[in-house]
């Protein structure tokens, strides 16, 4: 579950998001996935909207493919109509935990990195908290004696406190002791 629906459609496909697919081979992988699930008589669901997500009875499906945006999911601060990372984690565990052999689930807070790349500290911090909520949700749903949960980063970006901000300055603001740097460019505290 996540974003990236455009990568599953060909350029001429009629898509849920009114966008052109990006597949150069013109395959509609979502239709192929649905056809395979139907052919194998599997209980499955393909989701594109938060309403579909919220209406899904997770105990009645064994296979889930949820693509809620043409590209990346929205940052949580801007998210009005997509499931949260914690909600998707919960749904995945509800489906996967019925397997008597156990399961492996990968959950990524990918928007943390995107926010760092464009110097959006508030977005990066909020996305980190969203990942924490997903971890907390996972821990609440599994037998912790039987579960190995790893939290790691594929790479990281460090935070540094820059300048000499006064105590009452938000770390998400510009340095209030010198609103511009030597070369007249404003800089964020973190």
Question: Which residues are covered by each model-predicted region?
Answer:
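A post-motif C-terminal structural segment
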Residues: 1-190
